[in-house]
Amino acid sequence: MHKPLIISVVGAGGKTTHIHRLAEKYLKQGKKVLVITTTHMYLEKDTILELENDMETSVGRMKDALAQGFCMAGSPCEEERKMGPLSDHVTEQILPAADVVLVEADGAKPVSYTHLRAHET
């Protein structure tokens, strides 16, 4: 099975901008780029949202977008203009279709860094 390069971007600010710069770099190299999140991320115009009641259609749409080179995907989120993480089921199906996966991977909010608390080790 094909395993993509996975890059997780973390920090208090600039994650989305950095992800877009990385995406441009890899797209210029002819790579198929998937952008996802583990938390919440701004819902951009061409984002494909996972349909809870029709995951196979969602995966098909994501694979079609990746065949064209780029896919930003997430799940519907209660916060307006945000997307959430994909389900594990959809993630497992879509990752092999990408060459590079860029992940917005934390929710630092207004703090400059995050760290594990004692109960998280």
Where are these regions (language model features)?
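Solvent-exposed alpha-helices and their adjacent loops that cap or buttress functional pockets
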Residues: 1-2, 27, 63-66, 93-96
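Walker A (P-loop) phosphate-binding motif
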Residues: 2-26
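General beta-strand structural signal in soluble alpha/beta enzymes
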Residues: 9, 34-37, 72-75, 101-107, ...
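Short active-site-proximal "capping" loops at secondary-structure junctions
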Residues: 14-15, 39-43, 78
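Short glycine/serine/threonine-rich phosphate/pyrophosphate-binding segments
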Residues: 18-20, 110-113
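N-terminal phosphate/diphosphate-binding loop that engages ATP/GTP or pyrophosphate donors
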Residues: 24-72
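Phosphate-binding/switch loop-helix module in NTP-utilizing enzymes
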Residues: 78-112
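Conserved small/polar residues in nucleotide/adenosyl-binding loops
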Residues: 114-121
